Swiss-Prot record:
Family stated for the protein in its record: Belongs to the CbpM family.
Name of the protein described by the UniProt record: Chaperone modulatory protein CbpM
NCBIfam families, A to Z: PRK10265.1
UniProt-listed InterPro entries: CbpM
Functional summary from the UniProt entry: Interacts with CbpA and inhibits both the DnaJ-like co-chaperone activity and the DNA binding activity of CbpA. Together with CbpA, modulates the activity of the DnaK chaperone system. Does not inhibit the co-chaperone activity of DnaJ.
Lineage: Bacteria, Pseudomonadati, Pseudomonadota, Gammaproteobacteria, Enterobacterales
Amino acid sequence: MVNVTVTFTITEFCLHTGVSEEELNEIVGLGVIEPCENETASWLFDDHAAIVVQRALRLRQELALDWPGIAMTLTLLEENDRLRQENRLLIQRLSRFIKHP
């Protein structure tokens, strides 16, 4: 199976997601997304960054949050997901030691 990573220039990313370059600068500055590491001075973004921005835009529209609020919300949602996965793993490990009737 081949993994294909799509990358976007700043202009392509803005057109694809609907954010302005100013908003993109703020989003990157807040750490919501990061440009792909590359050798050139211009930013490139992958498809995961586009998904995160689309999720952020839904939060902005539905909850009327500003970008710092969105950054905090996304961080907390990611932490919640990570803790749920860790909890599932620990429950699986623990179930080996518990006798079921």
